[in-house]
């Protein structure tokens, strides 16, 4: 039976978590449990592998990190719930589950759509622009990297954050794209990452066909230190 481990990492620097994802993916084997990492990042712009420098409109003192996920430039900051999914797609296929990379993208989008629905909000994906939108405004960005049939990176869901830095970029490469966040639609006391993240996780693992007995998230597990094995 596959196990899915959920780790709550709090607020962590982007580059440190990114390199830990790479190490985890490169060193896992066919018996390694899949994992979800929940994290918030201090202010940072990340440029995807297809990113074009002209989408950074106004250089600021916010660092820009060239990363290996798919997609263009986006912004991360505290109050944005990031959910990284480290899933062995190859193993799921070997077990008879017809899960493609496109299916994983859809699962990420739908877990956000379903989370929004929990709050009575109608969100939707766009076939030509990955992510989740509300009335044309983007509330969630996503980007993945697949290495040897295993995923890393994931989604970034705007919950209760300062959206101002998005004005310095063409978010995800789209000029004039307006961003939004959960706080704009519900009481601020409810728009908190620690309240939203369990909903995201539950919808995601249900969509992928995990069951409650497979999930180690009744208590969130901290990531181990860099000096020990993840």
UniProtKB/Swiss-Prot annotation:
BP GO terms, sorted: protein modification process
Q: In which pathway does it act?
A: Protein modification; protein lipoylation via endogenous pathway; protein N(6)-(lipoyl)lysine from octanoyl-[acyl-carrier-protein]: step 1/2
> Keyword set for this entry?
Acyltransferase, Cytoplasm, Transferase
Per the UniProt record, the site (Lowers pKa of active site Cys) maps to 138
Q: Where is the active site?
A: 172
Describe the reaction catalysed, as an equation. octanoyl-[ACP] + L-lysyl-[protein] = N(6)-octanoyl-L-lysyl-[protein] + holo-[ACP] + H(+)
GO function terms (MF aspect)? lipoyl(octanoyl) transferase activity
Q: Which SUPFAM superfamilies match?
A: Class II aaRS and biotin synthetases
Q: What is its EC number?
A: 2.3.1.181
**Gene3D superfamilies reported for this sequence:** Bira Bifunctional Protein, Domain 2
Q: Where in the cell is it found?
A: Cytoplasm
An example Gene Ontology CC term for this record: cytoplasm
| Domain of life, source organism | Bacteria
Detail which positions bind substrate: 69-76, 141-143, 154-156
Remarks, anything else? In the reaction, the free carboxyl group of octanoic acid is attached via an amide linkage to the epsilon-amino group of a specific lysine residue of lipoyl domains of lipoate-dependent enzymes.
Function according to Swiss-Prot or TrEMBL: Catalyzes the transfer of endogenously produced octanoic acid from octanoyl-acyl-carrier-protein onto the lipoyl domains of lipoate-dependent enzymes. Lipoyl-ACP can also act as a substrate although octanoyl-ACP is likely to be the physiological substrate.
- Family matches, as NCBIfam families: lipB, PRK14342.1
State the protein's name: Octanoyltransferase
Q: Species name for this entry?
A: Actinobacillus pleuropneumoniae serotype 3 (strain JL03)
